[in-house]
Amino acid sequence: MPSPDSVPLEVLERAFQELRAVLGQPDRLNPAHSDPLYYFVYRPQHVLAVKRRLAGWMGILRNDGFEPVRVSLADIVHELIDESGRWEAWLELEHEAEPGDVNQAIREVLARNRALVNCVAERIAAGGPRTIVLLTEDELLHPYFRTRAIESALVGRVPHPTVIFYPGRRVGQYGLHFLGYYPEDGNYRSTLVGGLE
């Protein structure tokens, strides 16, 4: 019987092999024939296991002839907050402020002039014909932004295969359950990989 630690490894490796197959034939396997956007779905408790495997998976994708580029949503969020000039003020007020107020202020920075979406679009637009973008740290969007809002805003702006590493649960062909916290959302139209275990 496999140890509890090895179960996520097997599930994650199966999902990664499924992703490689999808990336090898993206047009045939995208049922909605939309932008080349994919969700690599895994259970939230496997976040660290995915992070540990990411460098190895990037190496495998390189061996497959791709040019993988990692784009961290955590880095983008931090940069946008830093550029807002509000970081120091928030740190000073943090002990007095209600968490909901701080979250709302961060949400406003990310949404103002579509800052988060535009920054993501700019990062995924860079690269060559064999580029694959791996969009990581999706879990850090909670509670500021929903991933589907980013997907919807990126329609027509995804020139390279882009894989969103999504901690949650897959429900059918188009449904996702983010972090096991939010209700199921059945309106995703991109290709979903993994997340059925």
Q: What kind of region is each of these model predictions?
A:
Residues 2-66:
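Glycine-rich P-loop/Walker A and Walker A-like loops and their local beta1-loop-alpha1 context
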Residues 23-27, 115-126:
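Short, charged beta->alpha transition segments
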Residues 35-39, 132, 161-163:
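Residue-level preference for the first positions of well-ordered beta-strands
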Residues 45-49, 76-78, 106-113, 139-143, ...:
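Short acidic, S/G/P-rich loop/turn micro-motifs used as interaction or catalytic elements
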Residues 56-70, 153-163:
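Structural alpha-beta junctions
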Residues 69-115, 119:
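Long, charge-dense
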Residues 128-144:
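Conserved P-loop NTPase "ATPase switch" module shared by AAA+ and STAND
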Residues 146-197:
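Glycine-rich, aromatic-bearing surface loops/beta-hairpins
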